[in-house]
């Protein structure tokens, strides 16, 4: 595929939309990834290319957060070990699985996100989360983050929210502390997944740079929406875009399992 000006502009727009949505509630990749696939990139290449924008968003988000609030790096670093291991495995699976199978998995994730968004409540509205330790298995915590890493490496979309959910609901971490840990870990694990995609050549660097530019500006713009407490409008548009993405992936993306299921 020889990129044109329209391809570059669409990639910037994909990053912009992803950055805004990710800053407000997460799962911005559910918008940018279908847009990159729509440009003609194979799903695995679109997945890898999108990670450049994701890394830019998370790095800038970490820097912005660090200038305002402290981050418990020790606790986050311990949990990041299993998260990184899972991420590497998930990314390897993503570059080896057949594109048609990945498409079906991705469509399933988008549909689940739509349902979850409709029926879930905001975790930040729950005041009963504390930093007090509770009786639980630390080993299970590590296994949970290993599973989160597998998902992060393969799909990534909504990963930050899933980490936040586990930290608050399972580990009973205060929401402010969970937000800090989530911000740090998101920034840490993304380069490991990106490395796997680079290693296997599943990156379009020119479009990836455009996604990164759009994502950086989108993250800044999303933060302004949060400051103005004008996030519901963006979330409504996110739902509309997500539904359109599902329809597009189902109707216009070739999903035939003609080339097997997994490459060894």
Regions found by a protein language model. Name each.
Residues 41-50, 72-78, 172-183:
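Membrane-interface alpha-helices at helix entry/exit sites of multi-pass transporters
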Residues 8, 51, 106-110, 114, ...:
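Residues within membrane-spanning alpha-helices of integral membrane proteins
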Residues 20, 35, 88, 92, ...:
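Membrane-interface helix caps of multi-pass small-molecule transporters
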Residues 48-101, 190-240:
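Selective hydrophobic functional segments
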Residues 60-68, 107-133, 246-261:
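Transmembrane helix exit motif
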Residues 1-6, 95-105, 134-135, 205-209, ...:
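Interfacial loop-to-helix junctions that mark the boundaries of transmembrane helices
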Residues 89-93, 145-157, 193-201, 208, ...:
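Hydrophobic alpha-helical transmembrane segments in multi-pass integral membrane proteins
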Residues 1-42, 128-179, 263-264:
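Selected transmembrane alpha-helices and immediately adjacent juxtamembrane segments
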